[in-house]
């Protein structure tokens, strides 16, 4: 962890993070993790700074040793209905609600917390400052990357396994060529433009 962080006075602290706000396709995926102080997971860091192999290894450790972990999501249709910002907060609420152990306090990556039934705090750059948030970022990233790999098998022409649905030049080219899948976010401008031209 980089900058030091002063933890709140609480016993069961959950970290929450999201992956997938920027892609043009698929769900926004969030995770909540309560780590076990008796069984620490070494090497936690912001998921974006880790190799895929390292993320996968840490995913296995986190899911094995954490006191509790869960995934929450908001689908493309929900993103289109309520916008990506609100959908992300909703997915975070779902992740916290799905925890098998109820946390005393929730630490959320970013600058805004969803409405939760327990105290919470937003931490800017929390995924590189707070172990619980780093763990959540890894769970969310691995989960979403696996979903994109599965989607790639259904629609290999779009290259989802490589770009994970982000608006790369390749993705935009294939979107223009093949049109949108049912999994694309219709409210996002590049997808909307393709649909308007269809």
Curated annotation (Swiss-Prot):
Q: What is its main location?
A: cytoplasm
- What job does the chain carry out? Endonuclease that specifically degrades the RNA of RNA-DNA hybrids.
NCBIfam families on file: PRK00015.1-1, PRK00015.1-3, PRK00015.1-4
**Which is an annotated GO molecular function term of this record?**
RNA binding
Q: What is this protein called?
A: Ribonuclease HII
PROSITE patterns reported in the protein's UniProt record: RNASE_H_2
Record localization: Cytoplasm
Q: Which GO terms describe its cellular component?
A: cytoplasm; ribonuclease H2 complex
Note accompanying the cofactor annotation: Manganese or magnesium. Binds 1 divalent metal ion per monomer in the absence of substrate. May bind a second metal ion after substrate binding.
Q: What's its catalytic activity? A: Endonucleolytic cleavage to 5'-phosphomonoester
UniProt keyword list? Cytoplasm, Endonuclease, Hydrolase, Manganese, Metal-binding, Nuclease
Give residues annotated as binding a divalent metal cation.
Answer: 17-18, 109
Family listed = Belongs to the RNase HII family.
Q: Which cofactor does it need?
A: Mn(2+); Mg(2+)
Q: Which InterPro entries match?
A: RNase_HII, RNase_HII/HIII, RNase_HII/HIII_dom, RNaseH-like_sf, RNaseH_sf
User: What is this enzyme's class at the first EC digit?
Assistant: hydrolase
User: What processes in GO biological process is this protein linked to?
Assistant: DNA replication, removal of RNA primer; mismatch repair
- RNase H type-2 domain location: 11-198
A Pfam cross-reference name: RNase_HII
Q: Do you know which Gene3D superfamilies this protein is assigned to? A: Ribonuclease H-like superfamily/Ribonuclease H
The EC code for this enzyme is 3.1.26.4
